[in-house]
Regions:
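N-terminal signal-anchor/signal peptide hydrophobic helix marking the start
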Residues: 6-15
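Hydrophobic alpha-helical transmembrane segments of membrane transport/permease proteins
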Residues: 15-66, 154, 158-176
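An internal, D/E-rich "acidic patch" concept
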Residues: 57-113
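Membrane-interfacial helix-loop-helix junctions in multi-pass membrane proteins
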Residues: 52-62, 76-87, 163-171, 189, ...
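Alpha-helical transmembrane segments of integral membrane proteins
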Residues: 2-4, 92-129, 143, 167-307
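A hydrophobic, multi-pass inner-membrane permease signature
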Residues: 138-146
Length: 307
């Protein structure tokens, strides 16, 4: 297991550098960020040259990338064009998005897996058909429609929640936004769990456990559920990074100043330092989540062992 972890960590190095280089190049293709600092009028050539020199934009792209990565390994993610450190923006945005992601994951795990197990064990029955139809409806509706509808009904019309989240973003105010973020993934987790449970319920090892006279609850939890969760864990693991970086629309709807909001502002203002800095952290989150998922395979299924 130890050698496997070391090998995976070594494999992450080229993936990390390749991904960050690609993002860095894509951000530089967006246009001249200095031009956006002067508003509608054109920047004075002397001022523009001074700003490019200050932010290192007068150097070749490959040299900018090497300088940036060297600073990253010292904990310096650069400075936004408004003079604020990117690390300060991260310190404000990431705790909010982490709380939002945890709320969304709880919805996915608790509701999604529970519904998947129930429908998988009752395949073809009315509850199975009902859940399949409901999940298909949820998948078909865009996230921004779900968010705006819940905000209008629960926040504006009925007054159950605040229409917008306060600056501190406490957990109780993130419940509905978390449900909106998790809605589509929750539906996929439900359907994936249902399919996996239904397939493994006919497996030989489950029939053997039943033939031995083991209690039904033990057969489901200890044997059927553990092996059926492998594809679900894979989906949830890859969904962690998507939830943290892909909640731009939901954060805009509920006025949440998290990672999605900062990425939106960075792209809108062509603030390359902010965009690259946040995406660099998200890449690390993706890589760490994938490694944890691989290690969980051996916990869920004893047949899987890493040399």
């Amino acid at each position: 297991m130890g050698r496997y972890v070391i090998r995976r960590l070594l494999q992450m190095i080229p993936v990390f550098f390749g991904t960050t280089l690609l993002i860095f190049l894509m951000v530089n293709v967006m246009g001249d960020p200095i031009a956006g600092l002067c508003g509608e009028r054109q920047c004075d050539p002397a001022t523009a040259a001074q700003l490019r020199s200050e932010f290192g934009l007068d150097k070749p792209v490959w040299q900018q990338y090497l300088t940036y990565m060297g600073n990253v390994f010292t904990g310096d993610f650069g400075t936004a064009f408004n003079g604020q450190k990117v690390t300060e923006l991260m310190a404000t945005a990431f705790p909010i998005t982490i709380r939002l992601t945890i709320v969304a994951l709880l919805f996915e795990i608790v509701i999604g897996i529970s519904l998947g197990v129930v429908t998988g064990l009752r395949r073809g029955r009315p509850i199975d058909t009902t859940v399949l139809i409901l999940t298909l409806v949820v998948i078909s509706i865009p996230t921004f429609v779900t968010g705006l509808l819940l905000q209008l009904l629960l926040g504006v019309k009925w007054g159950i929640i605040h229409p917008s989240v306060s600056s501190g973003a406490p957990v109780n105010e993130l419940i509905i936004p978390g449900l909106v973020v998790a809605s589509v993934s929750l539906a996929y987790v439900t359907r994936l769990t249902r399919t996996s449970i239904a397939e493994n319920a006919r497996a030989d090892y489950v029939r053997t456990a039943v033939a031995k006279g083991l209690p039904r609850r033990r057969v489901i939890i200890r044997h059927l559920l553990r092996n059926s969760l492998i594809p679900v864990v894979t989906f949830i693991g890859t969904d962690v990074g998507a939830l943290m970086g892909g909640a731009i629309v939901t954060e805009r709807i509920f006025n949440i100043h998290g990672v999605g909001y900062q990425l939106y502002q960075g792209i809108l203002r062509q603030n390359s330092q902010t965009v690259v800095g946040f995406v660099t952290i998200l890449v690390l989150v993706f890589l760490a989540a994938n490694l944890i998922v691989d290690l969980l395979y051996a916990v869920l299924d004893p047949r899987i062992r890493y040399a």
